[in-house]
Amino acid sequence: MIVKTKSGEIEGAKEDLYYSFRGIPYAEPPIGKNRWLAPKPIKPWSDVKSCKEFGSICPQNELVYEQEATADYETGSNQNEDCLTLNVWSSELNSNKPVLVWIHGGAYFLGSGADCLSDSEDICRDGKYVVVSMNYRLACFGFLRLIDLTDGKIPSTGNEALLDQIEALKWIQANISSFGGDPN
C-alpha cells in the first residue's frame, strides 16, 4: 500500500484488518552537524520509501532490574541516533477518523514507539481511531543542555526531546489525512 505524504511517497503493509506504516522519518537525522540541535523538518524524498519496519530507537541502556524487562521494551534492538521516526496504524485510508497519538514513557531514558504495538493494533482493529506513535531522542541525546558549557558554540537547550515530539506532531497534522485521520 503506497500513501503520498508531503514528504514523499511511502509504502506500508496491509495487515488483516488495518494498514501499518512503520519507521516514517518526520525530521532530519539528529547526527553530525544536527546533533544536540532542535529537529529540522524532513527534506522531501523522490523515491517510494519502504515503511514496513520500525525505525531505529534512540540509544539507551539496558534495564537495571532484569525483572522489569518485558516484551514491551525494545532496548536491545536497532539502536541509533538516527531515530526520529513515527508509526501509523489505520483501518481505513479514506476516512476522517480521530487520531490517537501515543508518546511512550520510560522516564525519558528508555522506550520506543514500538512499545505500544499490541495496543495500537487492537485500537486500530476497532476502527474508531488512527493510531500514531513516535521515537524521539532520550537521555543525554535529548536533554543535555550544552549552550552554557560551550559558551554558545553548541546551542543545545536541553529540551531537544520535547522539540522532537513537537516536530512529530507538526508532521502528523500536516500528513495524517493521507492515512484516514482528521488533522484537526
What kind of region is each of these model predictions?
Residues 1-159:
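Non-catalytic accessory segments of hydrolases
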Residues 154-178:
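Alpha/beta-hydrolase active-site loop
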Residues 179-184:
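Alpha/beta-hydrolase fold nucleophile elbow
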